[in-house]
A protein has these predicted regions:
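C-terminal intrinsically disordered extensions
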Residues: 189-232, 389-414
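Active-site-proximal region of nucleotide-activated glycan assembly enzymes
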Residues: 121-208, 214
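Donor-nucleotide binding loops and adjacent catalytic segments primarily
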Residues: 26-27, 46, 205-305
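Structural motif
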Residues: 12-13, 41, 201-203, 249-252
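Flexible loop residues that form catalytic
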Residues: 106, 203-204, 250, 311
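Short, basic, glycine/proline-bearing loop/turn elements
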Residues: 11, 72-78, 93, 168-176, ...
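Glycosyltransferase specificity loop/lid
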Residues: 2-114, 118-133, 137-150, 275-298, ...
Length: 414
């Protein structure tokens, strides 16, 4: 093994979250000990910052295509796309020569890392684990769900769920079979978390695993990240004495809901700070400040309430600052995350297909009236992540690899 083992982080930049976590993890490694590289689509590089790990080019499907398929309830990848991904992955490995690959939603690594004989560590969320304590799946927003009573729609979804989710598993299963790899269990959660080791970027107290979880599946804890972009000129003009709401739908939320959200929050007397992620927003009126992107940790720290799509990245920024979360959820990932927060009194979820000003105002007012949550800052990332890297590197350096390498100390999970 070289003096500085090369760790390749592979970011599937279909949403900003799947770039953010690899970028934060690559940045946390000691550069004197590790040669960290990050592979991502060219369009995502602007979010890495000047001091980031060396970037390597890698194709991803268009974020818009991913979002459209997700909203329609279709498989997010075709077999042909995953086949091309494997070709690109193997060319990347040949060029970079990594000792360890760390992936975030790059499903093709289930095949390509095994073909290359490179240890593969996957970053995911605990509510997607096959061994999550709560393994039920909520009904996402689909083209037909707004027209059906919700309780009836959920019961129907529960009955047909295996049939509905099977097509989402099929492309990767066929790809594995084509390369002589054994099939995975017929479970979307298995498809999302197949790796030599899986680390869950969640607070273990909020999203526990069951007692039957295997040793290679463990919590890492939250992975904080904000885009390394300058603050807008108006940032210093925010009124110190006014309660603020921080609103962002991110890269995977219903951007069309922004005007409705802003109006409802202004109706509660809140100032509103908005990160639009590039979505159009009517000219802000008094008490509204907008930018394409903001450092979410700073915005959440200024906010009395955070309104987002319910996904982990922004919600974790809110929790770290002690701000309650109002999640406007569309896809299953967002509903799963907000279910965990709501169960602990840290937030409320609204469905994007049943969104209206009265519901927004009522949910926000209830969160504002409740006691403010205690801040939940994430422990130092380097100390949590490095032991897992070292364990996998040590296993690869051993003459024979016969078992899953030992885990990092349990203290690495929050």
């Amino acid at each position: 093994m070289p003096a500085r083992p090369r760790i390749l982080f592979v970011a599937e930049a279909v949403t900003l979250a799947h770039l953010a976590r690899p970028a934060a993890l690559a940045a946390c490694l000691d550069p004197a000990r590790y040669d960290a590289r990050i592979a991502c689509a060219d369009a995502a590089r602007r979010f890495l910052g000047a001091g980031a790990a060396q970037a390597e080019p890698l194709r991803s499907i268009a974020a818009a295509s991913f979002a459209q398929r997700l909203a329609a309830g279709q498989p997010v990848y075709t077999l042909a796309e995953l086949r091309d991904y494997v070709t690109d992955d193997l060319a990347l490995f040949d060029r970079v020569q990594p000792e360890l690959v760390v992936g975030d939603f790059r499903l093709s690594l289930s095949v390509s890392a095994r073909l290359a004989g490179v240890p593969y560590l996957a970053i995911s969320n605990a509510y997607w684990s096959p061994w999550a304590a709560d393994r039920s799946l909520p009904l996402p927003v689909l083209p037909w769900t707004r027209w059906v009573p919700l309780a009836l729609a959920q019961r129907g979804f529960d009955l047909v769920r295996p049939l509905v989710l099977a097509p989402h598993c099929r492309p990767l299963q066929r790809l594995r079979r084509a390369h002589g790899l054994p099939p995975l269990p017929a479970d979307l959660r298995q498809v999302y978390t197949d790796a030599d080791r899986v680390l869950y970027a969640d607070d273990a107290a909020l999203f526990p695993l069951g007692d039957d979880a295997p040793p290679q599946h463990r919590h890492l804890g939250p992975v904080p990240w904000s885009p390394p972009l300058p603050l807008p000129p108006w940032w210093t003009e925010l009124p110190a004495g006014q309660d603020l709401a921080y609103v962002t739908m991110g890269s995977s939320g219903p951007a069309q809901a922004l005007p409705l959200l802003v109006a409802a929050l202004r109706g509660l007397g809140l100032g509103v700070v908005v990160a639009t992620a590039g979505a159009p927003l009517p000219a802000p009126g008094a008490g509204v400040w907008a930018a394409d992107y903001l450092p979410g940790e700073l915005a959440a720290a200024r906010a009395r309430i955070v309104v987002c799509n319910g996904g982990a990245p922004t919600a974790q920024q809110a929790l770290a600052a002690g701000a309650p979360v109002l999640g406007v959820c569309s896809n299953m990932d967002q509903f799963l995350h907000m279910r965990g927060l709501a169960a602990h009194g840290l937030g409320r979820a609204l469905r994007a297909d049943r969104l209206g000003a009265p519901a927004i105002a009522a949910a926000a007012a209830a969160l504002l009236a409740a006691p403010r949550p205690a801040p939940r800052p994430a422990p130092a990332l380097r100390e949590r992540f490095t032991p897992h890297v070292d364990a996998l590197l040590a296993a690869r350096a051993a003459p024979a690899r016969t078992a899953t390498p030992p885990l990092a100390p349990a203290a690495t999970a929050r």
